[in-house]
Amino acid sequence: MFSILYNLLEILVVLVPILLSVAFMTVIERKVMGSMQRRIGPNVVGYYALLQPFADALKLVIKEQVIPSQATKSLFFLAPMVTLIFSLLGWGVIPLGPGLALSDFSLGILYSLALSSIGVYGILFAGWSANSKYAFLGSLRSTAQMISYELIYSAAVLAVILLCGTFNITEIIESQQSVWYIMPLLPIFILFFVSALAETNRTPFDLPEAESELVAGFMTEHSGMIFVFFFLAEYGSIVLMSTFTAILFLGGYNMSPQVLFAEDSFINLQSIALAVKAVLIMFLFVWIRATLPRMRYDSLMTFCWTGMLPVAIALLILVPSLLIAFDISPY
């Protein structure tokens, strides 16, 4: 009984900061976009609008729950829960510091890839169960987009695995103590980041929820409390993807110079280093949203299959070839 309570406490210790970071990610996005568009942004609720996400959450919770009469009600309610659960499960293998991971098992990378692939089911259920043309078309777009860019995403991760020789996320971080992988793998980092934008349905790849075409895409018929689940899942995926990018290419919780990290320090500076890197990647997500226009859907698919995929395959062949040629393979 004590072990179960201890495990639940561990999960809460990880889950609460994640949900808070998701809440404040919305404030960061609105303030940054406001600055880029020469306007103030939210500035009423709390100091520097820090209480704005809680006001938005309260507004959504007290709204009326409207259910379409022709909807498949079981899947209609299940879809946002599935999407949020798979978004949060990805944090189970993320090391937030040395020894600070819920589960540090040897196949953590494969676990993360599997969850990112399964997460599309919630979106597909949402579009189909709502019995709406807008929602259904949005879910089909999302499914096709995520399956397509999953290939690029997986190829980029596989290149990192070939370089470090392990599937364990902690070992990948520890292998970057001297050199972060963004330096030797810069083209692969660019491919990974572009595919991460597509995986999270962010601009310029936000076709599944294009407001001017599909109202709100697969979320069109969802409102009130169940819409909050989709909202949390979307921004939770952005925070997770930013942290994962920092781990794979920016050294995770490693940071130079090492003298900053005294072993007897009261403050866990290494976790702060990971958080700073993740926030910088999140800023990049917001910057791209405020800068780039939405792509046409046929251009998006052509860009993936005829542009990015051949480059990803070529780089995936080049990385092990160079490792073998210079006799620096980790295997």
From Swiss-Prot:
Entries under Pfam families matching the protein: NADHdh
EC number annotated for this UniProt entry: 7.1.1.2
Segments traversing the membrane: 8-28, 75-95, 107-127, 147-167, 178-198, 224-244, 266-286, 308-328
Reaction catalysed by this enzyme: a ubiquinone + NADH + 5 H(+)(in) = a ubiquinol + NAD(+) + 4 H(+)(out)
Keywords: Electron transport, Membrane, Mitochondrion, Mitochondrion inner membrane, NAD, Respiratory chain, Translocase, Transmembrane, Transmembrane helix, Transport, Ubiquinone
Single GO molecular function: NADH dehydrogenase (ubiquinone) activity
Subcellular localization: Mitochondrion inner membrane
Lipid bilayer topology: Multi-pass membrane protein
Chain coiled-coil ranges: none
GO cellular component: mitochondrial inner membrane; respiratory chain complex I
Record InterPro entries: NADH_UbQ_OxRdtase_su1/FPO, NADH_UbQ_OxRdtase_su1_CS
HAMAP family, A to Z: NDH1_NuoH
Family: Belongs to the complex I subunit 1 family.
Protein name: NADH-ubiquinone oxidoreductase chain 1
Species assigned in the record: Mycosarcoma maydis
Gene label: ND1
